[in-house]
Amino acid sequence: MTSVWLTAAALLFVAGTLAAGSLPRIELRIEERILIGAVVSVLVGSVVTYLIALVAGLNVAVVLGASALSAVAFALPWWRRRAEVLASWQAGWKELASPDRRGHLVGVGMTALAAVVLFSVLLTHALGTDAAGNLNAGFQTVWADWSQHLTTTNSFAVAHNLPPQNPLFAGQDLRYPFIPDFQSATLVTLGAAPAVALELPGVLLSVCIVLLIAALAVRLGAGWGAGVLAAAICLAGGGLGFTGILADACLHHGFSATQCTWSGLVAHPGDTLGIVAGTLHDLPGLVAAQPRAYDGLLTPPALQPLPDQQWYTPLFAWWLPQRSILYGFSGALVVLILVITAARSGRRAYQSFALAGLLLGVMPLIHIHTLIAMAIVCAVLAARWPHRGWWITAVVTAIVAAPRLATLIAGPHGSVAAFNVFPTVEPGWMYGSSVARPALSLGSLAGGVGGLVRAVLTPQYWGFWIANTGVALPLCVVVALAAALMCVRGRVGAASRRVMSLFPRDLVQVALGCLAVFAIANLVVFQSWDWDNTKLFAYWYLGAALLLGALVVRLWRRWWPGLAVAAVASSVLLTGVLVLVRLLPWTPIENSVGGPYTSATASDVRVAAQVAASTPSNAVFLTEGKPNDPVLTLAGRTAVMGYYGWLWSYGTDFGSRPQDVRTMLEGCGIQARADCPVFGLLRKYKVDYVEIDDRTADPGIFDSRVDVRWWATQGFAVVARGDHLTVYDVRAR
């Protein structure tokens, strides 16, 4: 019946897409309505399914029934004017298919086809089962992050974790934005394999993001081509890391390290021609067999091409591994199209503002950084385009988001002992070497503003951002200064107006809102791990990408300006292109980054199936903290303490739990049972089962001194056993 249920779900999704796409009472192109409908159907429909599942449980009837209910709910507001809605769809199709729009239709079709092919190839390679039954990831970042997503997904689908408790930290409610994984759990409930359930929404939303960026560019006056280039930059844009391959090719040809530097070329101009020729000779071979990651991702600092690389290729740092940002970013793009169109429509358009508020209101369950970023961007746009509808967006957002926000605000925000307090103030983000990050307060914020101003005045700050993101920040700053100075008299004002004439005015307003996000993210860190502010910088980068795309399209027909701007755009994309080339088949196996990375062996898969079949769904397990622990990722069970790195980054207040977990895992040696603290701790944490794995050198293991032999001699009943791990029933302790 799996194919039947999945087909029914697909048909209901199409119905929901058409119904949701008919909600906005504003002038939209047909491709915009389809994309808006698809994103609203996924995001809001998933929340509706979750709310119903809280009452009725997660099963096939609930999944399909909630999808049908969502489609009906989307249709109710416009049903009485269905003739008008049908006419708008027909008019939209006629406009798209008209002869004078043929080029636009071809552009939309080619972009959609390219995006579908790209993301289908990448995401179907992200996770899968080989002929031997091993579950493998195709990328290291996917191996790491999707282990968490598998855990959350299967905690819903297999262990029926409703209302949701944190499967990585027993006894704590789930504060991680879980709706993306819950939506995948609904697909597992319908019969999809967990890997497919994670991959399918990823393909859909990734394609939607590419098309929505292009549609937004058209809406802002830049054109489809500018939008496609902006989407490419958002996916693969980076900094100057590509220069590292020039140095490697130079060294590979036999030149000295001194000769293979810019200063060396300047100091020995007579050798320049030979060095350049030798470098170019060896460059193709180095491109085909790259010895390191030139974006610095998962690379020790000593091997990174440039010092302090923190901006990695977005495709592999965010879009593939971090599923929540796909849901959040697609929702944000829909919000931008809705509010920009509604604010400039000359009509009340309150429904569109309300729909935007609904999407923002569910973001605390999906991607909290999107809510933060869009609050900043919308505040800037509201000042530029005054409209009463902004208040509707704000009120709806506040009402829908309030319950979840209250939970998050009241929850733990790390601890001083674990060095994971958040939010904190970090002027200039990660450009400096200082690790001091005071907790957010009025005093620290005031000091942080001063620190940021001082940072901006240093060459080190600009060197950091240019090395990491190339021309993106300088371009944004030039446009911002031009916008501020264009009304000034004299040469300064004239020069500013010439700069502004290169960009559509509406696009500049959106880019300035995105630049405001950059400023805030350069001051306040919103999670324990400061690198996670890249989830905010992604929205600044959208504005920078739109500016660069618009500039290229505007100037590319002019010879010298076109050549210059093409070179600038290429410099932003070169590092990402190198990273993508490294995935191709000709890369030597020792330098390959395309996996496989084993998430679970065939034996682990069997053990997980035994655990799921023979233990209560709400049982608590003592595990060794591996990110890819099969008891968590495949059986969906709850751990006393899962992977420490994730929990730390979420701002978990651990208390004594880490030390207690160590004590339990290491056993009591020859100590008498009456004096052994393990059994008291098992009772304290209400542990039902203990999983002991002899692969104590695996990545992420919390305590490598696990006493495998001690646990084997305690006489506990064995629930499941594999090649390396054993699960003991300790309820009779």
Predicted regions and their residues:
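Membrane-interface alpha helices of multi-pass inner-membrane proteins
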Residues: A53, F316-A317, S352-I366, A379
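Extracytoplasmic
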Residues: W556-R733
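Perimembrane helix-loop-helix junctions
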Residues: V339, A343-Y350, A356, L360, ...
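Membrane-embedded, hydrophobic transmembrane alpha-helices
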Residues: M1-R101
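Signature aromatic-anchored transmembrane alpha helix within multi-pass, membrane-resident enzymes
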Residues: L229, P386-A402, R497-R498, R554-L580
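Alpha-helical transmembrane segments at the extracellular/periplasmic loop-to-helix junctions
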Residues: T2-A15, V106-V117, A144-S147, P307-D308, ...
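Active-site lumenal/periplasmic loops and adjacent helix-entry segments of GT-C-fold
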Residues: H104, A114-G331, I368, V593-T598
